[in-house]
């Protein structure tokens, strides 16, 4: 889709990609506990076309389907991936002219990667450290946390720490939950952004319980840009 390139990599006697060089340095204050890519999300004009592409070319399966609506925008999303669950690729399609997906397609001049989700072992410390380094995240209203204990149940993290870091929480299984937060777009146009995500137990979802709060946060940014 768009200018996206898929690379096949076989590692043999290498720590990473050919030509990779480990540069010294990094974050001097705080700790950023990023581990690996959790999933990559695509925004496209025709979702089913690319779901079929991944099924026929890569042998992936469709593993989830979402139809999300707010008062002002909407999207449809299907998730494809391998049988083992190592690869997860949600694919979004706009279902309204003023949706965040349509805005992305307009600004990006076509289909492309909407966001990259990075897995962390400690999202509170990671988000705090990234903010100290200048990262900007979407804002979460304090009211989001009023019903959090009753909605997600007991979690290992301290709720006050989660609230101070403005992290979202969702329980997608009885024995699994996730914490997540999204950056603002990293370029001057509303295109690519990052997600920081932490999973506990057998969590395999994408924060479906947070979609309403996430959409409202994105729509606030769209209002600032005059997109809606």
Give the ranges of each region predicted by the language model.
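Glyoxalase I/VOC metalloenzyme domain signal
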Residues: 1-62, 72-228
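Active-site and NAD+-binding cores of ADP-ribose-processing enzymes
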Residues: 65-67
């Amino acid at each position: 889709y768009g200018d996206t390139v898929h690379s096949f990599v076989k590692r043999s006697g290498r720590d990473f990609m050919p030509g990779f060089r480990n540069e010294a340095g990094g974050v001097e204050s705080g700790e950023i506990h990023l581990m690996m890519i959790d999933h990559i999300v695509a925004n496209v004009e025709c979702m089913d076309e690319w779901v079929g592409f991944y099924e026929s070319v890569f042998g992936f399966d469709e593993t989830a389907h979402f139809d999300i609506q707010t008062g002002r925008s909407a999207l449809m999303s299907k998730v494809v991936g391998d049988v083992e669950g190592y690869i997860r690729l949600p694919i979004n399609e706009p279902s309204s002219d003023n949706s965040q997906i349509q805005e992305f397609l307009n600004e990006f001049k076509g289909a492309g990667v909407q966001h990259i989700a990075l897995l962390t072992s400690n999202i509170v410390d990671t988000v705090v450290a990234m903010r100290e380094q200048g990262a900007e995240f979407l804002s979460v209203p304090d009211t989001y946390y009023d019903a959090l204990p009753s909605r997600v149940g007991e979690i290992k993290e301290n709720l006050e720490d989660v609230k101070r870091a403005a992290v979202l929480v969702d329980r997608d299984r009885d024995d699994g939950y996730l914490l997540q937060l999204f950056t603002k777009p990293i370029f001057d146009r509303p295109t690519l952004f990052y997600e920081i995500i932490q999973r506990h137990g057998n969590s395999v979802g994408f924060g479906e319980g947070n979609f309403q709060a996430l959409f409202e946060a994105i729509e606030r940014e769209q209002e600032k840009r005059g997109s809606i």
